From Swiss-Prot:
Keyword Repeat: yes
Keywords carried by this UniProt record: Acetylation, Isopeptide bond, Nucleus, Phosphoprotein, Repeat, Repressor, Transcription, Transcription regulation, Ubl conjugation, WD repeat, Wnt signaling pathway
UniProt-listed PROSITE patterns: WD_REPEATS_1, WD_REPEATS_2, WD_REPEATS_REGION
UniProt motif Nuclear localization signal: location: 225-228
Lineage: Eukaryota, Metazoa, Chordata, Craniata, Vertebrata
GO biological processes: negative regulation of canonical Wnt signaling pathway; negative regulation of cold-induced thermogenesis; regulation of DNA-templated transcription; Wnt signaling pathway
Annotated localization: Nucleus
Official protein name in the record: Transducin-like enhancer protein 3
Region spans: SP domain: 269-444
Length: 764
């Protein structure tokens, strides 16, 4: 390591001819120190040079990673577009005359024959257009600093080769580089000036600091994108235990505030690339982990330092909720649109590509030109939204555009309750394109074909359709609110928590304390459902106990009128017949108990669910009952004949359901985060995708024109019946476990995991 000519070591004392002096020894030590210092300095300079090269290599690697990722998405996107266009052509061709059919078929075949020469010419033309566009809008592009190893920077890839792959990469790379923001140009200039000054500097540490400062401003952000993409890929490969609610314990602590929907850079309702972030952090030791009233079962109540206080057995389903990897009865899938339980469909890279519009400039716009913008349900109805990554607005890179575009709100949503949460990163041209947002409502035909729903022009307008809802009161219950119900006429709200139901008078604005408290069940057992009889004088309460409690509210002080005891250790949901003579209770053993309220006796049980029955609703005429269970089934029962009519099988546990008061439609909330709207006789259905986690409760408005659903993702969503246009959306601070709508459709009440109920006024 050291040259042979280094200073010799001093002779040992006693050798002949040596005279020891302190000054000479000091001089030798000084020379040795200077030599070592010079060696150290040269090594330091070499180290700094290598560190700078490493930084540059990492930066280039991230750039190429972005480009390859974007190309992969683009390839899948264009493949899917081609499939869909072929399907459309195949459907339209039979309507043509025989002569025209032959001409069209020949034209289609010719269109499929794309030679390498044509491909190279097209890519070269796109490069020229992008360069002219960049010169016109931003002036001359700022070139990258010279690469230390002599490699060509990605902004100027070679275009002389005949390989179409290299040409495609070059086209994308050059345009991605030319489209960099002015702010980044400033960073590049600043970095180059700093490099030129520091390369001549004596102190290499200054150079290192300068390069690290530049890296912090530009490269770390790209590495963050890369990490996000890798995180997304890993999340799509397996199901997180945090989102698998087989034991049906819902985290009721305040959820991670860093969920994408809270971020001010994103709009609430869309499913996008990084949607799963922040949804995996559940607190299983929350002392109040419980699910929703009348809609969501809970097999356990987890308490710190305690065993399960409820006599409810663990109801973990023997049938694990499978991933929706293949088409199964009840959950239809389309290539590239596979949905994972507990995760949005956008988590699949292919699905995210299909759901992420980039630009409107495309030759595929014609087949859908007849649709007006408010008829579209996001991007999938408009193939014109799928232009190549080379058409990305200049402010955005491929990955950034994909992530940002995935969060824009659909144009048919008439009211945005969170204006600060809109996707501020989107340029106005992209944020306002018609139909350029991800689809969230799909029609699933009898043969499993999934298509985005074209909304009618009156989807969000007309009599009986609300514009939005505003929060007017908060009822601090003090425990997790698993059950809520509203009196008719609208005056009192009943909130069920741990061991008691509290009654609130909402006719008095600003009322902060309950007017009464009904202690029932055991103190440590949660109320799961409470239902008022139509006369408003009787309240029936069920929960994590084998007993249903009937309260007389007409007496001066509410009192227990009777108790109904079943063999099941818990009741998850209740329903009352329209004539108020019969009560139906969903039992944790899967049975549906039928109670005669006048004689206070059990008159029959509907048996069919192989796991706990979680949710229930009754038809408006009182002839049909609908139940959902942890066995992944929804069943309908004929109340006159006392037998099962239908059974719908799904790939996810059923947590909530509601039957439309005007008939025909049944809405079902899933553990997999989907809402499905079924027709009572037809095999086709609608599938809605705005929730990010389990759908815990669901309720139809009494007019039947809309319904609301709430979830573990803290969201309250209002939907149009039956096709699911999003009317409004509200985000709470914790899981929303229960909900109810007043008989006049003017108020909504929700119960949540942060120990309160929220009263909303519906604005028309």
């Amino acid at each position: 390591m050291y040259p042979q000519g280094r200073h010799p070591a001093p002779h040992q004392p006693g050798q002949p001819g040596f005279k020891f002096t302190v000054a000479e020894s000091c001089d030798r030590i000084k020379d040795e120190f200077q030599f070592l210092q010079a060696q150290y300095h040269s090594l330091k300079v070499e180290y700094d040079k290598l560190a700078n090269e490493k930084t540059e290599m990492q930066r280039h690697y991230v750039m190429y990673y972005e480009m390859s990722y974007g190309l992969n998405i683009e390839m899948h996107k264009q493949t899917e577009i081609a499939k869909r266009l072929n399907t459309i052509l195949a459907q339209i061709m039979p309507f043509l005359s025989q002569e025209h059919q032959q001409q069209v078929a020949q034209a289609v075949e010719r269109a499929k024959q794309v030679t390498m020469t044509e491909l190279n010419a097209i890519i070269g033309q796109q490069q020229l257009q992008a360069q002219h566009l960049s010169h016109a809008t931003h002036g001359p592009p700022v070139q990258l600093p010279p690469h230390p190893s002599g490699l060509q920077p990605p902004g100027i890839p070679p275009v002389t080769g005949s390989s179409s792959g290299l040409l495609a990469l070059g086209a994308l790379g050059s345009q991605a580089h030319l489209a960099v923001k002015d702010e980044k140009n400033h960073h590049e200039l600043d970095h180059r000036e700093r490099e030129s000054s520091t390369n001549n500097s004596v102190s290499p540490s200054e150079s290192l600091r300068a390069s690290e400062k530049h890296r912090g401003s530009a490269d770390y952000s790209m590495e963050a994108k890369k990490r996000k993409a890798e995180e997304k890929d890993s999340l799509s490969r397996y199901d997180s235990d945090g989102d698998k609610s087989d034991d049906l314990v819902v985290d009721v602590s305040n959820e991670d505030p860093a969920t994408p929907r809270v971020s001010p850079a994103h709009s609430p309702p869309e499913n996008g690339l990084d949607k799963a972030r922040g949804l995996k952090k559940d607190a299983p030791t929350s002392p109040a982990s419980v699910a929703s009233s009348s809609s969501t079962p809970s097999s356990k109540t987890k308490d710190l330092g305690h065993n399960d206080k409820s006599s409810t057995p663990g109801l973990k389903s023997n049938t694990p909720t499978p991933r929706n990897d293949a088409p199964t009865p009840g959950t239809s899938t389309t290539p590239g649109l596979r949905s994972m339980p507990g995760k949005p469909p956008g988590m699949d890279p292919i699905a995210s590509a299909l759901r992420t519009p980039i630009s409107l400039t495309s030759s595929y716009a014609a087949p859908f030109a007849m649709m007006s913008h408010h008829e579209m349900n996001g991007s999938l109805t408009s193939p014109s939204a799928y232009a190549g990554l080379h058409n990305i607005p200049s402010q955005m890179s491929a990955a950034a555009a994909a992530a940002a575009a995935a969060y824009g709100r659909s144009p048919m949503v008439g009211f945005d309750p969170h204006p600060p949460m809109r996707a501020t990163g989107l340029p106005s041209s992209l944020a306002s394109i018609p139909g350029g947002k991800p689809a969230y409502s799909f029609h699933v035909s009898a043969d499993g074909q999934m298509q985005p729903v074209p909304f009618p022009h009156d989807a969000l307008a007309g009599p009986g359709i609300p514009r939005h809802a505003r929060q007017i009161n908060t009822l601090s219950h003090g425990e997790v609110v698993c059950a809520v119900t509203i009196s008719n006429p609208t005056r009192h709200v009943y909130t069920g928590g741990k061991g008691c139901v509290k009654i609130w008078d909402i006719s008095q604005p600003g009322s902060k304390s309950p007017i009464s408290q009904l202690d029932c069940l055991n103190r440590d057992n949660y109320i799961r459902s409470c239902k008022l009889l139509p006369d408003g004088r009787t309240l029936i309460v069920g929960g994590e106990a084998s007993t249903l409690t009937i309260w007389d509210l007409a007496s001066p002080t509410p009192r227990i009128k009777a108790e109904l005891t079943s063999s099941a250790p818990a009741c998850y949901a209740l329903a009352i017949s329209p004539d108020a003579k019969v009560c139906f209770s969903c039992c944790s053993d899967g049975n549906i108990a039928v109670w005669d309220l006048h004689n206070q006796t059990l008159v029959r049980q509907f048996q069919g669910h192989t796991d706990g029955a979680s949710c229930i609703d009754i038809s408006h005429d009182g002839t049909k009952l609908w139940t959902g269970g942890l066995d992944n089934t929804v069943r309908s029962w004929d109340l006159r004949e006392g037998r099962q009519l239908q059974q719908h099988d799904f790939t996810s546990q059923i947590f909530s359901l509601g039957y439309c008061p005007t008939g025909e439609w049944l809405a079902v909330g899933m553990e997999s985060s989907n809402v499905e709207v079924l027709h009572h006789t037809k095999p086709d259905k609608y599938q809605l995708h705005l929730h990010e986690s389990c759908v815990l409760s669901l309720k139809f408005a009494y007019c039947g024109k809309w319904f609301v659903s709430t979830g573990k993702d803290n969201l309250l969503n209002a939907w149009r019946t039956p096709y699911g246009a999003s009317i409004f959306q509200s985000k709470e601070s914790s899981s929303v476990l229960s909900c109810d709508i007043s008989a006049d459709d003017k108020y909504i009440v929700t119960g949540s995991g942060d120990k309160k109920a929220t009263v909303y006024e519906v604005i028309y």
